[in-house]
């Protein structure tokens, strides 16, 4: 992992070029650049890797002048949101983008909505298996992503990669963390934008499976994420 001071210095250098000014001018303005927290889940369901975090790790530390903060979170209903909360409190990001695996999907999909429901088809990594439970008793039935979903999809496609909008994040941990981060933003961080991106299986995962499944190389998944984030930063 790169030293954070080094990352910040590179960020200042890029911004100085972009805005035709001195690095010292940018350093004097601590709010001059955006912070984007990007999370990815650990492996679950018997898989040895999770393409979500593997792709997140490949993201540049700076995208369009924004600092990218990368974080692995557990595929656990209760613990995942607590770790994201800690990171939000510590880093004060402008944007939170959670990334998860949706095996069977053919490309990267940007989620539009999360629902107030946990209904696990398989146990999470802590053995928890909620059935028809509300995620937040006092929360609304659903939250819409506050990211520019269609612009994200369009920018990925503009770079020659497949991408689409999804209108269901499921009822597993992916939906849970998307809903709860949006709930956190609505209650405590009204200026923070948040949303979710699902990625397909990696080519590595499906190589030895008994039946053919849609997949993408990790590097292509990472590029798709990068282009999606570009659209968020440019908005």
Where does each model-flagged region fall?
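Cysteine-centered motifs
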Residues: 20-21
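An accessory alpha-helical subdomain
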Residues: 198-204
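Conserved TIR/SEFIR loop-to-helix hotspot centered on a Trp-containing motif
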Residues: 172
């Amino acid at each position: 992992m790169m030293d954070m001071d080094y990352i910040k210095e590179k960020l200042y250098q890029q911004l100085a070029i972009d805005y035709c000014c001195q690095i010292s001018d940018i350093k004097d303005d601590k709010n001059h650049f955006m912070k984007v927290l990007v999370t990815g889940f650990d492996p679950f369901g018997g898989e040895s890797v999770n393409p979500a975090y593997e792709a997140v790790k490949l993201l540049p530390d700076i995208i369009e002048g924004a600092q990218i903060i990368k974080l692995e979170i557990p595929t656990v209903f209760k613990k995942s949101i607590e770790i994201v909360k800690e990171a939000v409190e510590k880093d004060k990001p402008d944007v939170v983008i959670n990334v998860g695996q949706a095996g069977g999907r053919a490309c990267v999909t940007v989620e539009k909505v999360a629902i107030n429901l946990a209904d696990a088809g398989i146990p999470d990594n802590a053995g928890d298996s909620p059935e028809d439970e509300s995620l937040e008793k006092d929360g609304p039935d659903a939250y819409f992503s506050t990211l520019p979903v269609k612009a994200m999809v369009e920018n990925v496609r503009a770079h020659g990669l497949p991408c689409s909008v999804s209108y269901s994040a499921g009822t597993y941990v992916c939906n849970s963390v998307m809903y709860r981060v949006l709930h956190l933003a609505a209650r405590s961080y009204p200026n923070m934008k948040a949303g979710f991106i699902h990625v397909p299986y990696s080519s590595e995962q499906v190589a030895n499976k008994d039946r053919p499944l849609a997949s993408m190389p990790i590097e292509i998944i990472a590029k798709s994420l990068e282009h999606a984030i570009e659209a968020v930063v440019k908005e």
